[in-house]
Amino acid sequence: MSVTLRTTVLVLLLLVAGLGHAKIYKWVDEHGKVHFSDRQDHSVKQEVVNVKPRASKWSRFDIRIETVDLELTAEENQQIVDGVNHVYEFFDRVLSFDMYRTVPVNILIFKDMVSYRNYLIQRDRGWAVASYGLYMPSEHQIVVYIQEDRERTFRTIKHEVSHAVVDTIVPYAPAWLNEGLAEQMEMLERDDSGLYFESHPENRWIVAKAREQGRLTGIDQFLKLPSNKWRHSDMSGSGSVRAQAGQFVYFLLAKPTRRSFLVRLMH
């Protein structure tokens, strides 16, 4: 996979799946039926379709953001709102879920790690004090803290929003898929052409290192791992299952046929 693979999400007639940098070809068969494909076929006369996507007007949810002992700039607040809505939009338009079913969550942001950890301990979530953020299903709440790298805080929020969505609409999803999607949502962005994913540099490095050291779990074994054992391995911090899950989902999202497999898996 390329370092900066961008998976653009567009809708073109029957092509509901997102389109990468590949061109879209159109041709008419002998019966007058119009076909579309992202693969060039030299046996038929094709023409390249120039897609001109409309600007997104996605604004279905009113995102509630609460801060404790800190103040976000207007730009940061908007960045959070946009990021959350991008995640909702992705699940709705690409993974074909009805996002009106999703329970909007409240986002609580603490000024530092100490305040964040104290809050978790007070709510019997002490097991998660080493995390960057946490989604609390019973309270429909995402809790994070401002990290030294503030951009990482905003990525963490998108990560936890993904968990909130999956918990609501696909509670039976295997742990690797739940976490893999959340890892990729961190890298979800939008430009004039639509939604796209950047590669996750940290996960790419971890997986490459594990492969180099012979510690990378085989994909068949990885997919068969029960969710409870997967979570135990992830929480122990001794493996690379989280990074591998993120990279595998990244791989699945890179091509229309793989995305179709992912959609079927989740439905």
Model-inferred region functions:
Residues 1-9:
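Bacterial N-terminal signal peptides that target proteins for export
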Residues 8-17:
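Bacterial N-terminal signal peptides
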Residues 19-86:
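Short, cationic interaction patches enriched in Lys/Arg with P/S/T/G and frequent prolines
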Residues 24, 106, 181:
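Conserved beta-strand and immediately adjacent loop positions that scaffold enzyme active sites
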Residues 38, 118-121, 194-196, 264:
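Short, solvent-exposed loop/turn and secondary-structure capping segments
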Residues 59-174:
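Juxtacatalytic substrate-recognition/specificity segment
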Residues 129-139, 172-267:
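Acidic/His/Gly-enriched intrinsically disordered linker/tail segments
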